From Swiss-Prot:
Keywords: Cell membrane, Membrane, Transmembrane, Transmembrane helix, Transport
Transmembrane intervals: 10-30, 35-55, 58-78, 99-119, 131-151, 161-181
Function text: Probably a pantothenic acid-binding protein that interacts with the energy-coupling factor (ECF) ABC-transporter complex. Unlike classic ABC transporters this ECF transporter provides the energy necessary to transport a number of different substrates. The substrates themselves are bound by transmembrane, not extracytoplasmic soluble proteins.
Phylogenetic lineage: Bacteria, Bacillati, Bacillota, Bacilli, Lactobacillales
Protein name, entry field: Pantothenic acid transporter PanT
Domain of life of the source: Bacteria
Single GO MF descriptor: transmembrane transporter activity
Length: 196
């Protein structure tokens, strides 16, 4: 039991380290990436962690993802930083919005919870693919809905639709990446974990 808990903590720490490295790498790539689609990869450790370690640890990984999003949006100013940090002014205003905290944390925490339960329905590669799809879609749907609900009137609907289109385009790429990598990684990690 103690060995299993220690192993889970070690795996959790590895996932967090991967998330930090991926975020740093992504920030570099975004600056030189010539295409408008800039998908995130931070959902992958959260989804895979949820499947492998359970929904509680998945929720914790989602919280870490939210914290990374919040800190990055607070430090690195981009046109969409206000969506994830109340310390960045909303476009067209001189103040931030507390809803940035909601968008930064709640969708990400739920991405850490839902894949575990989806995977339990079909405990195989198909289940891993469905869990990856569900986790990625959860983030996309909640972020888009939040943009429209919390910022639609402030941004005027045309700008919120533009932001929505950007997020939706990114999410298609994110879903494809998540499904491919999760279906490849989860069986290998599950086997390695069961053998240890």
């Amino acid at each position: 039991m103690k060995k299993s808990k220690a192993s889970d903590v070690a795996i959790l720490a590895i996932f967090i380290a991967i998330m930090v490295v991926v975020q740093l790498f992504t920030q570099f790539v975004i600056n030189v990436w010539p295409f408008p689609v800039k998908p995130t990869l931070l959902h992958l450790p959260v989804i895979i962690g949820s499947i492998i370690l359970g929904w509680r640890k998945g929720a914790f990984l989602g919280l870490v993802w939210g914290l990374i999003s919040f800190v990055t949006a607070t430090i690195v100013t981009t046109p969409t930083s206000f969506l994830f940090s109340p310390f960045q002014p909303v476009i067209g205003t001189h103040h931030g919005s507390p809803w940035g905290l909601f968008i930064a944390f709640i969708p990400r925490i739920l991405v850490g919870i839902l894949p575990y339960f989806v995977y339990k329905i079909a405990n195989n590669r198909l289940g891993a693919g469905l869990a990856a799809f569900a986790g990625t879609a959860t983030n996309t749907v909640l972020v888009l809905t939040s943009i429209f609900l919390f910022f639609g009137s402030t941004l005027k609907w045309s700008l919120s639709y533009l932001l929505g289109a950007i997020v939706a385009t990114n999410s298609l790429t994110e879903v494809i990446i998540a499904v491919i990598l999760t279906t490849a990684i989860v069986p290998a990690l599950t086997k390695a974990r069961n053998n240890s």
